[in-house]
Amino acid sequence: MRIGRAAVAATAALLIGAVGCTNQIAGTATPDPTQPPLALSDDGYGIVAGYPDAPVQIELYTEPQCNHCEELQSAYGGDIERSINLGELAVTYRPLTFLDTPSTDEHSARVANALFLAVGAPEATDEANMSSGLEFQRFVEDLWAHQEPGGPGPSDQQMAKMAEDSGLPADVAGRVGDGEAAGNVNIGEMAAYNYGALIGIDPISTGTPTVYDLGTKQKVDLHDKDWLATLLSS
């Protein structure tokens, strides 16, 4: 347990609709222990924002064009951000791209790529360019606030500005703005893996956003507006 952990009540009143500083050691950068870390999940297809020993660990399945996913970030993003910062919560983001069509200019895939660019590869990243989980959560909130369902979505340059505004390192913003392909994941394989995992959680009501409690191995009821407060107080 970390000093100063306290329960954070969810302040959002919106009920979500249908679920549909680092030290250099031997040339390798290590995350700043005073900041919530950011890392790839063990399977390589998720992005973990938060301390690995946070008492509440969840997965969040989300699609960049899903309006209900935007509603979740709008309603709960601030509380998620604070809880990550306090060490109470760690979120494994699992992006999906099933809403991409020929008319969307790979909207969802490009946003997912930007998310994985934010993580980078620690062995290839100097200490000035390590992202934190807190910065990443802010980036997620900004991206989903600027979604364009059914359209091409934000440009690479617009996403780079969001990354910069979220506090992510300049190196990350530059890579996003250049439209660089993330070297730590294959977006197509990631989307297929995460969709399969989502079906495994709920093969009947399969949709986004879906929150999965890694502690209880249960899907969280997002129709309960107090779902986050309940998790943090359990």
Residue ranges and their predicted role:
Residues 55, 111, 207-208:
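A structure-centric signal for secondary-structure junctions around beta-strands
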Residues 70-152:
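Structural alpha/beta surface segment adjacent to cysteine/selenocysteine redox centers
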Residues 24-25, 160-234:
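C-terminal cap of thioredoxin/glutaredoxin-like
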